[in-house]
Amino acid sequence: MLLEAPVYKEIFGAVTIHEVQKVIKMDTETEDVPVYTISNIPREKIYNLLGKMAIIVPMKNEKLHLVDGVLKAIPHKCPIIIVSNSKREGPNRYKLEVDLVRHFYNLTHSKVIMIHQKDPGLAKAFKEVGYTDILDGKGKVRSGKGEGMIIGMLLAKAIGAEYIGFVDADNYIPGSVNEYVKDYAAGFLMSESDYTMVRLHWRHKPKVTKGTLYFKKWGRVSEITNHYLNLLISEHTAFETTIMVTGNAGEHAMTMKLAEIMPFSTGYSVEPYEIVYLLERFGKWENVDEFKEVFDQGIEIFQIETLNPHFHEDKGQEHVKEMLLLSLATIYHSKLATNSLKKKILNDLREHKILKENEEPPKPLVMRPIKEIPIKEWMEIVEDNSETLLRFEL
């Protein structure tokens, strides 16, 4: 794969954020590229890394033909982890998903693990290992994207994955999913740190306007979230920046070493919260001994602009408003947010009629890192008590 070499970067304490890199060519061999402004990641290295990377697919009541396309597009070497929060009654959409996955396995013999987010075996496992952050007042796993991601990460850790990548199940272009996974691998191969995150910036998000396709560059929520993340950085460096372009990147990946030391927020705030947390915790040289290896190696965040456009399911205006509120809430409640930044966020949310005059954004609910969870014990409890766990080739 040929990519623009990362030239400009923003350094915030131990965190390095690389400027967005465009994919120039999807597939290359080992020949050297005699140009310093281009990075060459040979296909052999990418394919070697894919076997060490689990792809997590959180889903909830998605169209089955979209799910089918996404699964078929994930490179064969990658273990697939499906965490579904779909209906199990009236109608039982989860059963339909299981049937689809069984058929997919029979055709491909891909490595797949599948589980339902509300499986009582999961709740029991979390309770017994003392990780109650993910449970609601009734002792069940909460419904939320962040919760599904944590379940996926633990399953990935249980099978020994060194890298994890997330892809959404509502993608209309299966070929783009194949690219996303290879983009993740390219990002990891460019990194010099064991603590690395790769976030994707879609080249375009096409919309149907007046009967034709309009290839829009930015999503509505992304544009606003990125603006405030950049302000958060700028107010502490005293230099204006536009470095962050992936604040709401649902398609992102990280090394397991990074994933297991990070707390995660619930719902749609999860992706911007990842950035906010890294800036808060590793943006200053404080309490270094707790994470000495992390501070020594540094954290690298790569942003890669995809070759493919991104078509996904339109979930309506209310969904957009909720995403915007929860995304900006993470920045508003950050320890790094200044009073002037908070005021700008409040004005923006009120202008969009998302908050009333005297309201504040809700404080995000944050779940502890998974590092201290005894993974073998957790997995054994899940296997012994699960109603929905399926394992193929794993």
Curated annotation (Swiss-Prot):
Keywords: Cytoplasm, Glycosyltransferase, Transferase. It comes from the Archaea. Pfam families: Osmo_MPGsynth (PF09488). GO terms for biological process: mannosylglycerate biosynthetic process. One of its GO terms (molecular function) is mannosyl-3-phosphoglycerate synthase activity. GO terms for cellular component: cytoplasm. Coiled coil: none annotated. InterPro entries: Nucleotide-diphossugar_trans (IPR029044), Osmo_MPG_synth (IPR012812). Pathway: Carbohydrate biosynthesis; 2-(alpha-D-mannosyl)-D-glycerate biosynthesis; 2-(alpha-D-mannosyl)-D-glycerate from GDP-alpha-D-mannose (MPG route): step 1/2. It is found in: Cytoplasm. Transfers a mannosyl group from GDP-mannose to phosphoglycerate to form mannosyl-3-phosphoglycerate (MPG). Belongs to the glycosyltransferase 2 family. This is Mannosyl-3-phosphoglycerate synthase.
